[in-house]
Regions:
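ABC family nucleotide-binding domain
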Residues: 5-6, 10-142, 147-148
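Conserved beta-strand-loop-alpha-helix hinge in the C-terminal portion
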Residues: 152-177
Length: 179
């Protein structure tokens, strides 16, 4: 009946999200009882899939987590926890990644490494990343940037530069304070 088909649709949506969509949140949502490696592999564990060890190694090395895999979240800095969350979002090689301020808790060097890695995953893996950020430098890594104000798109920039984005964001802040 209807209930059975609703559950079937819900199950299929869950599988789609688990397999084809990655999420990078501002709050890391790491499981405290698991190690960094177990947290990274969680989407694969839930799916009953075997990890691609080469991909895991690339993620871990790029994100600077090699020496931290056996640490639990409370033994990691905020930046390290965010990098674990990013690796977890990318471990399934999702087609689409939603990133909410993915570098918000990282220092400038770690931010640049993470943004470069996200850019590489777009160029080399064909992933699509939708990133929300208030950081002009982070936005400059995008192929396209949309600037929103009051729920409306006020600018659409292809291949944005940090200077362009900084200027646009400043204009929007000034406009918001005048209203």
């Amino acid at each position: 009946g209807l209930v059975g088909s609703e559950m079937c649709i819900r199950d299929r949506l869950t599988l789609l999200r688990r397999r084809d969509i990655g999420f990078i949140f501002q709050s890391f949502n790491l499981l405290p009882m698991f190690t960094a490696e177990q947290n990274i592999l969680m989407p694969l564990t839930l799916a009953g899939a075997k990890p691609d060890r080469q991909w895991l190694r690339l993620l871990v090395e790029t994100l600077g987590l090699k020496e931290r895999l056996n640490h639990r979240p409370n033994e990691l800095s905020g930046g390290q926890q965010q990098r674990v969350a990013i690796a977890r979002a990318l471990i399934t090689k999702p087609k689409l990644v939603f990133a909410d301020e993915p570098t918000g808790n990282l220092d400038s060097v770690s931010s640049a490494e993470v943004l470069s890695f996200l850019k590489r995953s777009v160029n080399e893996l064909g992933q699509t990343i939708i990133m929300v950020t208030h950081d002009a430098v982070a936005a400059s890594y995008a192929d396209r940037a949309l600037v929103f104000a009051d729920g409306q798109i006020v600018a659409d920039v292809n291949k944005p530069t940090a200077d362009q984005m900084s200027e646009l964001l400043m204009k929007e802040r000034e406009a918001a304070t005048m209203n």
